Regions:
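Alpha-helical transmembrane segments of multi-pass membrane proteins
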Residues: 17-19, 85-111, 138
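Small-residue-rich hydrophobic transmembrane alpha-helices
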Residues: 9-67, 72, 105-119, 123-124
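Interfacial/gating helices of multi-pass transporter permease domains
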Residues: 1-17, 85-92, 154
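Short runs within selected transmembrane alpha-helices of multi-pass transporters and secretion channels
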Residues: 24-27, 98-117, 123-132, 152-168
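Small-residue-enriched core segments of transmembrane alpha-helices in multipass membrane transport
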Residues: 14-15, 129-136
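Membrane-helix interface/capping residues of multi-pass secondary transporters
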Residues: 3-6, 121, 149
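Short alpha-helical transmembrane segments in multi-pass integral membrane proteins
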Residues: 34-101, 143-181
Length: 183
């Protein structure tokens, strides 16, 4: 699709990566708290820490998504200086798609950190592989064929939405403690 398309999508993905890195740091703070509580047999603390972390991570990502949506031109303009270019247009489109997908990415990340903290490494690996593998790779082939260059801009955001939905259902299916009242 050309250099402009690649530049626009790359800039959007890197901006999202910075926001996601903050979320990863937050999740890394959650994991030892949850793991310690689980190891000590403090089920109510595991429940509370998961619930608190999931809610605050989703709220944080909603806030970041709203800010990204509102200031998309300014954020992308820091890296792309020509407003009418294909790169700027695709960066804005991709950033808006990321803005919608941010809460879903939070669900996926916190779910993966939760399973890792519990020592359920197979489940943690499965959840972690959803974003960049299981959901992402098929969408790389499907979305550009359906939507052309716009499909390229939507791939990562669509993968995050799918991964977040699958993570939420998997969390509930595996008898997660998130939606039970604390003891």
């Amino acid at each position: 699709y050309g250099d402009g398309a690649m530049a626009g999508v790359t800039v959007a993905n890197k901006i999202f990566a910075v926001i996601f890195a903050v979320l990863v740091g937050y999740g890394q703070g959650f994991a030892p708290v949850c793991g310690f509580a689980y190891g000590a047999g403090l089920e109510s603390r595991v429940k509370r820490s998961l619930r608190f972390t999931m809610i605050t991570a989703v709220i944080f990502m909603c806030a970041m998504g709203a800010a990204t949506w509102v200031w998309v031109s300014e954020v992308a303009g820091v890296f792309l200086h020509e407003g009418g270019t294909q790169a700027m247009q695709l960066a804005a489109l991709s950033l808006r798609a990321h803005a919608i997908s941010m809460p879903f990415a939070a669900v996926c990340l916190v779910t993966g950190m939760y399973y890792q903290a519990l020592g359920a490494y197979g489940k943690a690996t499965l959840i972690s592989a959803l974003r960049q593998g299981v959901c992402f790779i098929p969408l790389v082939f499907i979305l550009p064929r359906m939507y052309g260059v716009d499909g390229v801009a939507f791939v990562q955001a669509a993968a995050d939405v799918l991964a977040g939905i699958v993570s939420a259902f998997y969390l509930l299916y595996t008898n997660c403690l998130l939606y039970t009242s604390p003891s």
